[in-house]
Amino acid sequence: MAANDIPLQENFDVKKYMGKWFENYRSKEIPFESGTDIQAIYTLNPDNTINVTNRQYMPDKKVWDRIEGTARPLNPNQPAHLLVKFFSWQPPGDYRVLYTDYTNISVVYSEASVLDLFDVKAGWILGRQQNLPQVQIDQAFEIFENITGLSRDEFLKTPTGKAPSLD
């Protein structure tokens, strides 16, 4: 399926999506997430962009690592497809909400072309809690397999329970 043909969450409500999400699973190929207890916190800015704060605990250093960026819809008519930018020199990253119920789970997909030679696909299963029920995890993997072709064995369970609380 071509990247532009991937169905996204219909009637996406960005305000309901705001708040804290915990990473439950991620693609194995994501090199910049090496910590535990990974979280994403989204807040709506006055200009309708989204402040993105990603945090992960680094157990070897016993510190929280964080990065902040800004997300905006690629197209106002398709608010579930966002572009996220963390560094001014870096092109924005692709962020597509394939599915969310806003209160429990979010299935997020990203695709990027590398030098127009090949595409890199990535996915995340996010939850409002750190450890989602198995039925929701299975539902998320089914969405990935049916819509993007990513299979369960291309994902890692995000390690949890090693970090001191920040809240």
What is the role of each PLM region?
Residues M1-D167:
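A beta-rich soluble binding module of mature secreted/lumenal proteins
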